[in-house]
Amino acid sequence: MDFYHFAKSVVYGVLKPLYRLDVKGTEHFPKEGGVLVCSNHIADLDPPVVGITAPRPINFMAKAELFEAPILKNLLPNLHVFPVKRGLSDRNAIRTAISLLKDGQVVGMFPEGTRRKDGTLGKGMSGAGFFALKGGDTVVVPCAIIGPYRPLRKVKVRYGRPLDITPFRERKAGAEEVTEAIMQEIRLLIEKEKSAK
């Protein structure tokens, strides 16, 4: 077992019972090929929760400052985390994400770009659409996290059916249009869960 899967099993063993994680829709994940997982963002725990519930190893961007700490500099790459310089158009991070997708790997992102602690869904940033369009044959798997995170209170994680980006590519749609389509899929997952209460 490599370090990534070891860490995943340890974190899963802690977070699953603590937040009574209720996960559905993992069968929608393609077993191979590039996948961009796009989720709403309600708390700092979202990246590890998506990481431990996704059925395939998932790569995330994290602010470059985290890599300045010696321990994290060595640890984060083993957790499939790569640096991004926030507030800049970081070409290295962009190239890394696109390369991972074209290589048939999974990249996770939170299109809102910031946490929405009230649980409402914000506007998605065009980066999600950009990566979806530029990532070769990448498909998008929408994800909804329904909280809040409170110990021993159920947190729901829902993965939706893959969104095929081919029609958008064929008609040369822009990144913003693709992002809006992605956000709509996330919104539908959230609304479906809330209406089921």
Where are these regions (language model features)?
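Aromatic-capped interface at the extracytoplasmic side
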Residues: 17-24
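Non-catalytic C-terminal accessory region of glycerolipid acyltransferases
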Residues: 2-3, 92-197
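Secondary-structure boundary/capping positions in well-ordered alpha/beta enzyme cores
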Residues: 21, 56-57, 82, 104, ...
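Glycine-rich, highly charged phosphate/nucleotide-binding loops
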Residues: 22, 89-93
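Short amphipathic alpha-helix with an adjacent loop that forms part of the alpha/beta core around
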Residues: 27-29, 98-99
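A residue-level signal for beta-strand positions that form part of recognition/binding surfaces
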Residues: 20, 34, 57, 137, ...
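Catalytic core of membrane glycerolipid acyltransferases/transacylases, capturing the structured
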Residues: 3-9, 13-17, 29-88
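Residues at the C-termini of beta-strands that transition into short coil/loop
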Residues: 27, 64, 85, 144, ...
